[in-house]
Amino acid sequence: MLRWITAGESHGPALVAMLEGMVAGVEVTSEDISTQLARRRLGYGRGARMKFEADKVTIVGGVRHGRTLGGPIAVEVGNTEWPKWETIMSADPVDAELLADQARNAPLTRPRPGHADYSGMLKYGFDDARPVLERASARETAARVAAATFARSFLRQVFGVEVLSHVISIGASDPYVGPEPTASDLAAIDASPVRAFDKAAEESMIAEIEAAKRDGDTLGGVVEVVIHGLPVGLGSFISGADRLDARLASALMGIQAIKGVEVGDGFETARRRGSQAHDEMRPGPDGILRSTNRAGGLEGGMTNGEALRVRAAMKPISTVPRALATVDMSTGEEAVAIHQRSDVCAVPAAGVVAEAMVALVVAQAALEKFGGDSVAETTANYERYASGVAARLAR
């Protein structure tokens, strides 16, 4: 089974991603990972930290000469800002006198509404929010994006598919309504300042960000992830835990600041009658055809051959320049929340992180379905299955 885990803190020496269960022969280089991490840094409305918090990638194990070996994979994403934080974030004990002179070591006792600060301090018994925010930070997603680079390559090699995303809306901007983008549109989407597929939508989103910036505020939005060309039958209806839509929802909700997920037309489907909610089928020259894709490529917890389409709603960033009211946990008195460097809007980057989680989950489901110890073996298993499906549909 494909499994992943990350370790590290926002201002620690590095983030580490571990990926276990990936087959041998997946083609990935350090440059490939760096490319995906650079995409994660895209987006109008990002803070100044994006300019100097570079991602230095080191593949520690599981890869030789650009191909996976079949064993556990470890990737380190170094923090170029580490020298500034080495004393504050040292894993070993530090003399109190050294810490006293460090402005960065000032206790953070005023939790930010909407952040993990308050609950984390109480749950783990911390007097300071620093240990909470260091791990809860969205910086951790860099490690997930690194791990997902292997899943993306696996899906490309076995199925010939690409994972892509685009921003549907930011703040109160009019949501994009139109055709789903394809892999050939990805470069144009990444070239957009807000990773929008539509120029008019892009202008509306930028205007929203500019207004929020002037007001000392932050914005959330909605992103959509799309994969064209997946085979029928990834996932299962056998149990709730096996349903691919449930697994995708869990993975997307596990991204920092994501507060809602929908598959296909999702919540809008609940407003329709059944005759207008489902995707009718008809015979075609090469199999079953659908006139719509309201289900987002998933029925009964399984892929149905249509484009996989899922959306995630991101709340506004909780580090608000116009600091929100809170309580100082050291005194119990009214206060304003702590404010550190932050973005006005990170929705474009959230799309790249959402791609990563979808890639990991879909690759996991693909390996469960087709097995194998190498790309060649998994591909052969898939092609045999695909031939059988095609033969059934040709009857």
Swiss-Prot record:
Biased composition (Basic and acidic residues): 272-283
Annotated residues for binding of FMN: R135, A136, S137, Q256, A257, G300, K315, P316, I317, S318, T319, R341
Signal peptide: none
InterPro entries: Chorismate_synth, Chorismate_synth_AroC_sf, Chorismate_synthase_CS
GO CC annotations, alphabetized: cytosol
UniProt cross-references to CDD domains, sorted A to Z: Chorismate_synthase
One annotated GO molecular function: FMN binding
Protein known as: Chorismate synthase
